A protein has these predicted regions:
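Helix-loop-beta segment of a Rossmann-like dinucleotide-binding subdomain
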Residues: 49-60, 74, 94-133, 154-155
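Dinucleotide-binding Rossmann-like beta1-alpha1 core, especially the glycine-rich loop
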Residues: 18-96, 216-221
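Flavin-dependent oxidoreductases
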Residues: 21-23, 146-223
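Helical element adjacent to the flavin cofactor pocket in flavoenzyme catalytic cores
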Residues: 109-167, 171, 175
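Residue-level detector of anion-binding/catalytic polar loops
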Residues: 84, 136, 186
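Glycine-rich nucleotide phosphate-binding loop and flanking beta-alpha elements
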Residues: 9, 67, 123, 175-176, ...
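Glycine-rich FAD pyrophosphate-binding loop
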Residues: 1-14
């Protein structure tokens, strides 16, 4: 049973960036991310519902020695999980992606298999797949109370009705802290502002431009 306080994608999902990357800061995260991309591709065929995937790849650039070492370590990890990754020097980056100012760039890694997806479309694809496997989804059903007995979860109260259960998966994003308090659990989570800029059309910008991540400047761009 999935309980949605409003409607699917009505929270922060609708304006999410939708980046689907494979490379993570650790082996475990890399494995999970690769599984996610594979799952989306599989479900597109299984439930006949698009995930809105655009396989344009992703380019991460480094402007400090520390960041360059980090990206190279991540590239090694990616190779262990058969993730296609290519290490590029600044000259190659400038040649292939002239939109990038490489004056301060040391190098970068290209992940051709990375993609971007439509968050709303992905959500409804997952919901469709879940329903086909017997899941029930109830919208406009905010959880009013989490019921515990002898220190264990025993149910939730929704619209004055009690649903008995043994386990709860809390997937409420930035609202998880408040929901956790209903069960006496302290979740150290606090939302932070995030900004994005939409530009005017850029002449001759390739439709296949990869997502470009500049971690040193805490920014990314995508077409």
């Amino acid at each position: 049973i999935l309980l949605e306080r409003d409607q699917l994608t009505s929270g922060t999902t609708w304006h999410a960036a939708g980046l689907v990357s494979q490379l993570g800061p650790s082996a475990a995260i890399t494995k999970i991310r690769k599984y996610t991309l594979d799952l989306y591709k599989e479900l597109e065929k299984k439930v006949d519902h698009s995930a809105g995937l655009r396989l344009n790849g992703a380019l991460s650039i480094a402007e400090t020695k520390g960041r360059w070492q980090e990206l190279q370590r991540q590239a090694t990890t990616a190779q262990l999980y058969d993730v296609d990754v290519r290490i590029l020097d600044k000259d190659q980056i400038k040649k292939d992606y002239p939109i990038v100012n490489t004056e301060d760039v040391i190098g970068g890694i290209l992940m051709p298999g990375d993609s971007a997806a439509d968050p709303k479309v992905v959500t409804h694809m997952l919901a469709k797949a879940a329903r086909q496997e017997g899941a029930q989804i109830f919208e406009k059903s905010p959880v009013e109370e989490i019921i515990t007995k002898d220190g264990k979860i025993s149910g939730v109260k929704v619209k004055g009705q009690t649903i008995e259960c043994e386990y709860i998966v809390l997937a409420s994003g930035m609202w998880s802290r408040q929901i956790g308090e209903k069960a006496g659990v302290s979740i150290p989570l606090y939302p932070a502002e995030h900004f994005y800029i939409i530009t005017e059309p850029i002449e001759n910008l390739s439709k296949t431009l990869p997502t470009i991540r500049d971690f040193d400047n805490r920014t990314y761009i995508k077409e």
